[in-house]
C-alpha cells in the first residue's frame, strides 16, 4: 500500500498548492492500472475525492470516463475554467484521469 499512500500525499500537496495559487481546475493523471482492470491508485484517488467533496474541501470532480460535454459537472467546470475546453482528454473517456474543480 505504500505506493497508494505516496500517491495520495502527492495529490493532497498538488491540490493545496494549486488552490493557494488561484487555480480552479486541475487534472489528475493517476493511470488506470497495469492490467487495465485494477488501478489501486485510481480507486483510492476517486474515493478520497468523493470524501473531500462531501466535506466541502473541493467543489466537485469528474472521472475521465465521464469527462464529456454531456456531463453536467463537466459543463460547470467549463464555465469555471474555459481553458478546459481545449483539454485533449475531453470526450476521450480516459479512465486514467480525473478532473478536479477546486
Q: Where are the regions that the model predicts?
A:
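Long, charged, low-complexity intrinsically disordered regions
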Residues: 1-102
